[in-house]
């Protein structure tokens, strides 16, 4: 982190192996750098420079929920939106765009899908959660830009892409 930078950095860790055992090992490693990581302890969140959010294999949830002190948070799904799990455990709601929306950027977004998207974002934000979708169109072109535009207009917090330069051009063109 930069010496005079006071923002937050989200480290999204995508577990591709068995979640519970991988998370337990990761937790041991995060403890070595406890001064860097946002921490949940006994019902309270203490912010720090880096907030680790665990994504990927869902089995990581069980050991995480059992911890009274942890240096990582859980990446929820749309099914978690409105659940009893608080934002102090699930600060991020992520899901597969293609499984939840039929619109892929061709023509205007159907009004019902725009309303659904905005409802998801509104509900999450009221709960103190951020929103991200993966599996959005990611080939350069008008379809991708149309989807990104709708995501921004709806207030989605994270745009998921493998084309960082393309995203930067898109955001720069919109003064973001």
Locate each region found by the language model.
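Catalytic cores of phosphodiester-bond hydrolases, prominently lipid phosphodiesterases
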Residues: 1-176
């Amino acid at each position: 982190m930069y010496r005079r930078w006071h923002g937050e950095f989200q480290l999204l860790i995508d577990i591709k192996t068995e979640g519970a055992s991988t998370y337990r090992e990761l937790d041991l490693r995060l403890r070595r750098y406890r001064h860097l990581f946002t921490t949940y302890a006994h019902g309270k969140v203490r912010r720090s420079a880096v907030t680790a959010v665990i994504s990927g294999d869902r089995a990581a949830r069980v050991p995480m929920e059992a911890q009274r002190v942890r240096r990582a948070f859980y990446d929820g799904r749309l099914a978690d939106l409105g659940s009893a799990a608080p934002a102090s455990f699930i600060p991020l709601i992520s899901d597969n765009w293609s499984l939840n929306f039929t619109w892929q950027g061709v023509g205007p977004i159907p009004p019902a899908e725009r309303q659904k998207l905005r409802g998801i974002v509104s509900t999450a934000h009221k709960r103190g959660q951020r929103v991200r979708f993966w599996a959005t169109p990611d080939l350069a072109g008008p379809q991708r830009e149309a989807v990104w535009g709708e995501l921004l207009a709806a207030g989605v917090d994270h745009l998921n892409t493998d084309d960082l330069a393309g995203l930067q051009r898109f955001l720069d063109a919109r003064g973001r």
